[in-house]
Amino acid sequence: MASAKDIKKSILAPVLDNNPIALQVLGVCSALAVTTKLETAFVMTLAVMFVTALSNLFVSLIRNHMPNSVRIIVQMAIIASLVIVVDQVLKAYLYDISKQLSVFVSLIITNCIVMGRAEAFAMKSAPFPSFIDGIGNGLGYGFVLMTVAFFRELLGSGKLFGVEVLPLVSNGGWYQPNGLMLLAPSAFFLIGFMIWAIRILKPEQVEAKE
């Protein structure tokens, strides 16, 4: 049974020490696409966390009964089933957000973070640590998404979670929204800035020169 210290490490390490986006540069496409609003970024975070945690759990449970030759196919079948569940739940209860997220919910199937943790961790670990690892990597993914979405929504529309925070010129205020922040390139540069800032704080993450 994993100790409380191991659980804490598994949950917190992917946030800064081994972030799937900032360090491993995985899952960047969705990070560019769904971060125009905090609302969509938050829902995407929950979706990826749900799929990663449960796919890790199920893969770990059957890892000793899975032929090596078909393990990738089995992993993808598990992940695809979970993504279908998420997609249907969003369409049933959060239809507007589901429309905004568009195809990116379905593309969780191809998210390198989900497949990577199933193959690299769940195939070699017990079910509970695998489940916790999935939650931790979902949080690490969400940390980047929420940070990027915070600046994009605030500077791009003057709002947070759809609520006006900066007085807009159109409403007699002083802030003119920066439309550039709502375009995908702004997310690319914000993620790049985050990677730079994290590696300033943690120089051990800088790749060694060849």
From Swiss-Prot:
At the top level of its lineage, which domain of life is listed? Bacteria
GO terms, biological process: sodium ion transport
* Keyword Ion transport attributed: yes
* Catalyzed chemical reaction(s): a ubiquinone + n Na(+)(in) + NADH + H(+) = a ubiquinol + n Na(+)(out) + NAD(+)
In alphabetical order, the GO MF annotations are: oxidoreductase activity, acting on NAD(P)H, quinone or similar compound as acceptor
Protein localization: Cell inner membrane
Topology term for the membrane:
Multi-pass membrane protein
- TM ranges are 42-62, 72-92, 103-123, 131-151, 178-198
Q: What is its EC number?
A: 7.2.1.1
Fetch the Pfam families from UniProt: Rnf-Nqr
Task: Identify the enzyme class.
Answer: translocase
Question: Which UniProt keywords are listed?
Answer: Cell inner membrane, Cell membrane, Ion transport, Membrane, NAD, Sodium, Sodium transport, Translocase, Transmembrane, Transmembrane helix, Transport, Ubiquinone
Provide GO CC annotations from the record.
plasma membrane
**PANTHER family, sorted:** ELECTRON TRANSPORT COMPLEX PROTEIN RNFE, NA(+)-TRANSLOCATING NADH-QUINONE REDUCTASE SUBUNIT D
- Similarity comment: Belongs to the NqrDE/RnfAE family.
Q: How does it assemble?
A: Composed of six subunits; NqrA, NqrB, NqrC, NqrD, NqrE and NqrF.
According to its UniProt entry, what is the function of this protein?
A: NQR complex catalyzes the reduction of ubiquinone-1 to ubiquinol by two successive reactions, coupled with the transport of Na(+) ions from the cytoplasm to the periplasm. NqrA to NqrE are probably involved in the second step, the conversion of ubisemiquinone to ubiquinol.
Q: What is this protein called?
A: Na(+)-translocating NADH-quinone reductase subunit D
The organism named in the record is: Aliivibrio fischeri (strain ATCC 700601 / ES114) (Vibrio fischeri)
**What gene is behind this protein?**
nqrD
